[in-house]
Amino acid sequence: MKEIESFLVYSSSILPECILIFSSIGILSIDLLSLPNEGDTFWSYSISLAALAISIIILLLQWNKEPVLTFSETFQISRFNDIFRFFLLICSFLCIPLSVDYIRCTKMPVTEFLLFVLTATLGGMFLCGANDLISIFVASECLALSSYLLSGYTKRDVRSNEAMMKYLLMGGASSSILVYGFSLPYGLSGGEIQLRGMVNGLINMQMYNSAGVSIAMIFILVGIGFKLSLVPFHQWTPDVYEGSPTPVVAFFSVTSKVAALALATRLFHILFSSLSNEWHLPLEILAILSMILGNLIAVTQTSMKRMLAYSSISQIGYILIGIIAGDSDNGYASMITYMLIYIFMNLGTFACITSFGLRTGTDNIRDYAGLYRKDPILTLSLVLCLLSLGGIPPLAGFFGKLYLFWCGWKAGLYFLVSIALFTSVISIYYYSRIIKLLFTERNKRITIYMQDYKGSPYFLIPNNSIGITMILCTIASTVPGILINPIIAIAQNTLF
């Protein structure tokens, strides 16, 4: 009976991940057993979306379960880990409808795309709950390799191939640095691989305050800095964003950030909890550099995707305020709250530029001039998402930033919050510049695609899958502003 009970506990702990594994096998089987002209894409999309929806429901049903360590203490179930797993599932669930029309227009294979998306989601979910160094590395590489393949998904596009190579080379280098950082506390602790066991081993060996642990912390910070696109580890981000397919950029612009934030928070909270003074300063410097350079360089961009790349760099700088503030001042709760809102703001913006790009074939910001005349619904959605990203009241982004900055201020991060407020004003400038272009200027060098542009209906009924994602994300970027208190209460319930 004890073995059966243990099996049920273990299997239920990774049941959402198991559903994604079985759905991936099902999608691959459909592709292998069906003829090319049978039109199996409907079933592939349906299986993937159903698997993600079921996984979300299971996670919600498991919300009140007690924290538990399973699989020889290599995987941890807790509310904090579950909220990040939930974020990853939401991202994937919204990104798949975003890609349907894009894949149909570019005539790219569906099965490979869905497999890479589900595999990346699977790796990110395992990374959120991984409790030992081996599981952390394997899960992070599963997420990273799937992201590399997604960035080079359009093989016939030279820019996509270039983006994949840059992402692969930089990602491989960062993974090597991260593994080297893991190797130092592993050796100094006497061969421990579990996170808390490693801390106990370092204390017992009287090596916790040694130079080796400080060096390991620096290497781990560099490795995570790449995954979060923090300045100065951000060089790959604009090129990869510009060269990769837009739905792919939408996907890993949020999933990689969510998984890396979960990993960073757990490492700093568990492994380096007594060294907060040592890692606070470098993390503050990275946050300041990311906020300043990300927003300043975004002002000069002419490509919408490159602008969003630098915008995402600055947004992560804001989110780091929550990690630095820590648990005592609701820093983690503010980070979770803003991350949830950021997912919808970012995906909503990418849904708008995906729809515009498919209809016009351009990504240049100046080609958006006068869009409101052709497509008022797309214009309204883009305006609301950009204003929410800038933190304009009463949209959700304003309340998310307000809570994040307030928690940072209470934690004594006065200079960091002041920089965040100043750079937020800069971000409002380049967001409002795009909004002004949408309403006031006309594009004289209009393309043939823009001449035949068919706008969405004037009523809020989307006529394609991109429109569904766009409307949902726009609503989620707006409505939570008046429902921020319940969201904050849920976030405060997810702490360690």
UniProtKB/Swiss-Prot annotation:
GO terms for cellular component: chloroplast thylakoid membrane. It is a multi-pass membrane protein. One of its GO terms (molecular function) is quinone binding. It comes from the Eukaryota. Coiled coil: none annotated. It is found in: Plastid, Chloroplast thylakoid membrane. One of its GO terms (biological process) is ATP synthesis coupled electron transport. Keywords: Chloroplast, Membrane, NAD, NADP, Plastid, Plastoquinone, Quinone, Thylakoid, Translocase, Transmembrane, Transmembrane helix, Transport. Its EC number is 7.1.1.-. It is an enzyme of class 7 (translocase). It catalyses: a plastoquinone + NADH + (n+1) H(+)(in) = a plastoquinol + NAD(+) + n H(+)(out); a plastoquinone + NADPH + (n+1) H(+)(in) = a plastoquinol + NADP(+) + n H(+)(out). The chain crosses the membrane at residues 13-33, 41-61, 83-103, 110-130, 133-153, 168-188, 213-233, 245-265, 279-299, 307-327, 338-358, 380-400, 413-435, 470-490. HAMAP family: NDH1_NuoN_1. PANTHER family: NADH DEHYDROGENASE. NDH is composed of at least 16 different subunits, 5 of which are encoded in the nucleus. NDH shuttles electrons from NAD(P)H:plastoquinone, via FMN and iron-sulfur (Fe-S) centers, to quinones in the photosynthetic chain and possibly in a chloroplast respiratory chain. The immediate electron acceptor for the enzyme in this species is believed to be plastoquinone. Couples the redox reaction to proton translocation, and thus conserves the redox energy in a proton gradient. Belongs to the complex I subunit 2 family. This is NAD(P)H-quinone oxidoreductase subunit 2 A, chloroplastic.
